[in-house]
């Protein structure tokens, strides 16, 4: 990747970005980190990398791997609230059939829809997928991934906007910080992600019929 600008310092970034990106690619998915936390996480920010650098094949490989990790055969049978009392209600109870661990949830590791994790990594995974559609304009792939998107949107609504006010709670969905509401809150960042996802879904639905 070459960058050509009048600024000699900016021109060095192409190789640096490509090298860093290649370092977090494990052949199947983008990893959480290159050195520390070198492990897969479905919705970590690394998955924006492929499309930004023109590596759309890697991006699609990542998205396919985690689409196969979406729960599809466990309906929600346990109502809100389903928080873990041992952890002072700070996290969802890890039990299949709760709102979090039911259809639509994307599990922690690629091609494995049986492994719970405490994050809502759905949110950024879907945002990255939608950016992939923006970058590539690949309507056939959008059609293929449509069921994944629909299940995700229903899952987010069930879990994080049960009062239907259009404002979504946040649950460990981006950087885990008290300043960003680790759990609950009807906050701006999770609402903004969901607003964009629903708006993009409407556009995609119109295009794919």
Residue ranges and their predicted role:
Residues 16-20, 65, 148-159, 200-203:
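Alpha-helical scaffold segments in carbohydrate-active enzymes
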Residues 37, 70, 149, 156, ...:
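Aromatic-lined carbohydrate-binding surfaces of glycoside hydrolases
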Residues 2-146:
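Substrate-binding groove/exosite segments of carbohydrate-active enzymes
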Residues 32, 96-124, 154-209:
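The feature captures the catalytic groove of carbohydrate-active enzymes
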